[in-house]
Amino acid sequence: MKFIDEARIEVIAGDGGDGSASMRREKFVPFGGPDGGDGGRGGSVYAIADRNINTLIDYRYAKKHLARNGENGRGSDCYGKGGDDVTLRMPVGTIISDMDTGELIADLTEHDQQVMLAQGGSGGLGNLHFKSSTNRAPRQKTDGKPGERRMLRLELKVLADVGLLGMPNAGKSTFISSVSNARPKIADYPFTTLAPNLGVVRVGPSKSFVIADIPGLIEGAAEGAGLGHQFLRHLQRTGVLLHLVDLAPFDESVDPVAEATAIVGELRKYDEALYEKPRWLVLNKLDMVPEDERKARVADFLERFEWDGPVFEISALTGQGCEALCYAIYDYLAEHSDAHRAAEAEDLAADVRFRDEPPAKGGAAPGDDA
């Protein structure tokens, strides 16, 4: 499955129907008076969150979504029919923003959450509304209002519990395929992963968590180098980060400590909050290290890396240590899930895009650089 995390669409609500300027024409009723009906309202465009959808790929191909116009009013007090609404189903976790103003329209965080993207125009008034004691045969009527038209950006932040960090070829794809149902492309060269992969790890009946594998980072990723920088935002909602390190690189000139340090540096440059997120060190590819050298190599790495957090030694290829790691992750998430949700709510509340301030002139959102 190819994972699409961003799309741009245009939504066009329906125009309201025009009111009717009609007079009652009936035998034996010489002064029938006005009987023009109102126009129907235009259809609106809605988005609804659907947990059964996990990509935005449909919106890469269907970029324009139009609701129906309202029908015009007619004589005999006939009101126009309202235009049909359009409902767009999107993955849970989709963020919808206006491309012209920068306004955050919605953050779809719950299944079946519904939000209006473009409101249909109201219908015009028929001449029936303009009748008065001094104007018994009004010819006035009003036209329907045009519907809203918007260019929207859809961004999907993966709702994963665990995020994988690491240099290209650190074994992240092998790890996620060994512990979950995800089947990413795996090969012995860097940048095998070109798009995020999601996997569900099950540690027992009704006990599971979601893990996300993003493209590997390289030095300079925070400034846009490599592939991983554009997917770092997926990790902002995870509860814990797993930093995978290749402890046995094929190229002997590669220093695992230097690579691990570079990853931490890029994380901090990209987002301080992401840097402060709980992070576990996972030393991978132990099967490539002679058994009598493993203890010394691990100790040397931890000493030079100056790491005092949780450490796990695994081989994603053989599965060694993976089960214990998964159980530890589940226990941690079960213990800290409430705190994680509360922290995420605080982050969303602090987001400038949620404020009630109007956008600055010129289309820039509050907080954007001029």
Curated annotation (Swiss-Prot):
PROSITE patterns attached to this UniProt entry: G_OBG (PS51710), GTP1_OBG (PS00905), OBG (PS51883)
Gene3D superfamilies listed in its UniProt record: GTP1/OBG domain (2.70.210.12), P-loop containing nucleotide triphosphate hydrolases (3.40.50.300)
First-level EC class: hydrolase
Coiled coil location: none
Alphabetical UniProt keywords: Cytoplasm, GTP-binding, Hydrolase, Magnesium, Metal-binding, Nucleotide-binding
Disulfide bonds: none
Ranges where the record places region Disordered: 127-146
Cellular compartment(s): Cytoplasm
Positions contributing to GTP binding: 166-173, 191-195, 213-216, 284-287, 315-317
Cofactor(s) listed in the protein's UniProt record: Mg(2+)
UniProt binding sites for Mg(2+): 173, 193
CDD domains in alphabetical order: Obg (cd01898)
GO BP terms: ribosome biogenesis
Principal subcellular localisation of the protein: cytoplasm
InterPro entries in the cross-refs: G_OBG, GTP-bd, GTP-bd_Obg/CgtA, GTP1-OBG_CS, GTP1_OBG_dom, GTP1_OBG_dom_sf, OBG_GTPase, P-loop_NTPase
Family: Belongs to the TRAFAC class OBG-HflX-like GTPase superfamily. OBG GTPase family.
Function as written in the Swiss-Prot or TrEMBL entry: An essential GTPase which binds GTP, GDP and possibly (p)ppGpp with moderate affinity, with high nucleotide exchange rates and a fairly low GTP hydrolysis rate. Plays a role in control of the cell cycle, stress response, ribosome biogenesis and in those bacteria that undergo differentiation, in morphogenesis control.
Protein name: GTPase Obg
Annotated organism of origin: Burkholderia lata (strain ATCC 17760 / DSM 23089 / LMG 22485 / NCIMB 9086 / R18194 / 383)
